[in-house]
Amino acid sequence: MNLLIFMLNMLLKNTILLNMNNSKRKYLKTFINSYPSRNYIITHQAKEFTSICPKTGQPDFGIITISYIAEKKCIELKSLKHYLQSFRNEGIFYENIINRILDDLVKVLKPKWLEVKGEFSTRGGINSIVVAEYGKKNK
């Protein structure tokens, strides 16, 4: 019975959170890139990323590294922190986390190049690294 209640709660929580996915982008704020003609790489690293395993309901921990070459906009760090924290209570697979972050940042920044890398803590003796990329690095 407890397992059934847990699964129903996870299903309801995931349904609510899936409906909120588009609103996560609201956290992301930008500022003007003062050097748009220069191809310099900006890298941000969140060493305390957390989400929830959608299968077990247990917390997942990882390091998210975001690197990009800005076009007209750069990401504001406080907003990035709040955006990444919004995954804290969401049941989501590693692959989906990285691709959603990539899609959201590309939509907001419209960068020349962007890479999102997730290095997730060992679970069941296996650690996972997921990398997704947009654009050309040497544009």
Give the residues covered by each predicted segment.
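N-terminal intrinsically disordered, cationic/polar leader segments
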Residues: 8-139
